[in-house]
Amino acid sequence: MGLSAKAESSGTCGPNLKWHLTDDGVLIISGKGEMADYSVPYNSAPWRYFGVKRIIVGDSVTTIGEYAFSNCSSLTSVTIPNSVTTIKEYAF
């Protein structure tokens, strides 16, 4: 059995938030509070090149960070709950 390289498919995206990318391109943001801010190209969101097709933001997320989803050109659906009160510049 050999080892194979696999792209990072989960991690943190804020002090109390986690992200997970499913095999079929669904990005799930979970936890409570604010997302981190990102910038292009030096501090890009970790899912930037993963071909995200759908985003589901969890019920306790309050802020979507700068440039969080700015390069997700394959998006077909985004679910944002009422708990999100701030969407920062260039988030999409």
Please give the residue ranges for each predicted region.
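A generic local structural motif
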Residues: 1, 14-15, 41-44
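Amphipathic alpha-helical interaction surfaces in cytosolic regulatory modules
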Residues: 46-47, 63, 67
